Amino acid sequence: MVIFGLSRRIKRCTKNPIIAELKVYSPKYGDLLRGRDPLEILRRYERAGAVGISYITDPKYFRGNFDFFKRLCKETELPVLRKDFITTKEEIEKTAEAGGSAVLLITRLLKDKLPEFVDHAREHGLDTLVEVHTLEELKIAIQTNSTMIGINNRDIGKLELDDGNVSLTAKLAPLIPDKFVKVSESGITTLEDLKVALKYADAALIGTALMKTEDPEKLLKSFVEAKIC
């Protein structure tokens, strides 16, 4: 694990910084693996130029597996972001012990505990991606010492069953101080979506769109290498 490896890679990236999510299941679209080897998809993401890898460990809604997260961290030199509904500091420690580089902390879940969870994660060498969906949540997030703030274009409270779009990034990202790395999450399916996202954010996190296609390497490469004016 490289300390704060994800935020550093985003800052140094010379192409479009895309965090590619290895998403095995979606409450909206169902099975996204469709019999494919997840490690082969990882290799495709690496070849396409992903700036980092994201994996959801939640088993209930997204059918994630923490043991596979640990394996991912060993299989790739890219920084790996753990996404889950984290509510205990023990989960943060487990993430660091597994070799993770970053952890998602959801403002809506943690509320007034958010600052101490951010500090705890950073003490363990983890980047923190503090997730927001509303202006009220953003006001809380910018008071923390997080390295990154993520704008979830979809409502995680609805388990991504809503049709979010990058207009929320356009609305909230300009309000985030420059000391934070800004990440646009979810709802990015086309090059036009990506252009809007990266006009306002420093990086984009894309999962479903990549997993739904038969050739995730080709699509991701087109996103990474696209000219963003």
Curated annotation (Swiss-Prot):
Q: Which Gene3D superfamilies match?
A: Aldolase class I
Matches recorded under Pfam families: IGPS
User: Which EC number(s) does the record attach to this protein?
Assistant: 4.1.1.48
Catalytic function, reaction form:
1-(2-carboxyphenylamino)-1-deoxy-D-ribulose 5-phosphate + H(+) = (1S,2R)-1-C-(indol-3-yl)glycerol 3-phosphate + CO2 + H2O
Per UniProt, which keywords does this protein have? Amino-acid biosynthesis, Aromatic amino acid biosynthesis, Decarboxylase, Lyase, Tryptophan biosynthesis
Task: Tell me the superkingdom of the source.
Answer: Archaea
Question: What is one process in the GO biological process aspect for this record?
Answer: L-tryptophan biosynthetic process
What is a single molecular function from GO for this protein? phosphoribosylanthranilate isomerase activity
Keyword match Thylakoid:
no
What PROSITE patterns does the annotation carry? IGPS
Q: Which NCBIfam families match?
A: PRK00278.2-3
Family as reported in the entry's similarity comment: Belongs to the TrpC family.
Q: What is this protein called?
A: Indole-3-glycerol phosphate synthase
What is the species listed in this Swiss-Prot or TrEMBL entry? Pyrococcus abyssi (strain GE5 / Orsay)
Q: Which gene encodes it?
A: trpC
